[in-house]
From Swiss-Prot:
It comes from Prochlorococcus marinus (strain MIT 9215). Keywords: Cytoplasm, DNA damage, DNA recombination, DNA repair, DNA-binding. Homotetramer. Forms an RuvA(8)-RuvB(12)-Holliday junction (HJ) complex. HJ DNA is sandwiched between 2 RuvA tetramers; dsDNA enters through RuvA and exits via RuvB. An RuvB hexamer assembles on each DNA strand where it exits the tetramer. Each RuvB hexamer is contacted by two RuvA subunits (via domain III) on 2 adjacent RuvB subunits; this complex drives branch migration. In the full resolvosome a probable DNA-RuvA(4)-RuvB(12)-RuvC(2) complex forms which resolves the HJ. The RuvA-RuvB-RuvC complex processes Holliday junction (HJ) DNA during genetic recombination and DNA repair, while the RuvA-RuvB complex plays an important role in the rescue of blocked DNA replication forks via replication fork reversal (RFR). RuvA specifically binds to HJ cruciform DNA, conferring on it an open structure. The RuvB hexamer acts as an ATP-dependent pump, pulling dsDNA into and through the RuvAB complex. HJ branch migration allows RuvC to scan DNA until it finds its consensus sequence, where it cleaves and resolves the cruciform DNA. This is Holliday junction branch migration complex subunit RuvA. GO terms for molecular function: ATP binding; four-way junction DNA binding; four-way junction helicase activity. NCBIfam families: ruvA. It holds the Pfam family RuvA_N.
Amino acid sequence: MISWINGELVETWQTNQKFFVLINCQGLGYEIQILESFFLKLKTNQISNKKITLWIKHIKKEDSDLLFGFTSKDQKFFFIEILSVRGVGSQIGMSILNKFSISEIIKAIKTQDKKLICSIPGIGQKMSDRLILELKSKFKSKIQIEEEKGQEEFEITNPEIYKLMEDLQLTLQSLNYKNKEIKTILPFLIKELGLPTKKEKNLSFENLLNLAMNHLDQGNSNLAR
C-alpha cells in the first residue's frame, strides 16, 4: 500500500475533468490523479521545483490500482472521510476538493448549505443530504479548528484571500518547507500585505509564493551563518 511519495515530476496531463501527474521515484513511474488547483500550478510553472511530495490514497480494484495524490495530509484524510459516505466514489471526492477548499466544505456541512454542496458536479439532492447527515458529527471538532484558524489566527474573512492563503500553505508543504516555518510566514504575509483590509484584487498566487519562498529562504540563510 502506497501512502506517500517523493519524486521527480515527469509529465502532467488532463483527461476530461481528471488531472494527472507521472512521478519518477527510484526508477519507477507512478501515475497519480491530483487536484485541479495543483495541476494548474504545475502547468503554469508557478512551482519551479519539479521534485514534489504527495500524500497518497491508494485504492485497489479488481482490474486496477488507483493512486490519488494530495499536497497535504489534511487533504488526504478529508478525501478518505468523504469516501466513507454511502454512494460517494473517488471521482465525486475529487470533484468536491476541486470545487471548494476544505474549510468551505466543512462550513457548508455545518450550516447545511445544500445549494453549495449541490453545485458540485455529480452531487444531487439525495447525496447532498447523505453528506451532511454522515459527516456533520465527524467534522464537529474540525470545524472549530478551521474557524479558529480563519478568524483568530489569520483574521481573514474574505473567502478569496482565505483560499489563496490555504493554497499557499499546501504548496509550501509540497515543496518540503517545514510546517513550523510555514506557520510563521503566513501571519507575516498577512501583516506585510494588509490582506484583511486591503483585499488586493491584483494579488497573484505567483507573487505570494515568491514572496513567501524568498522570506523563508532568507531566514534559513541567516540561521546557517
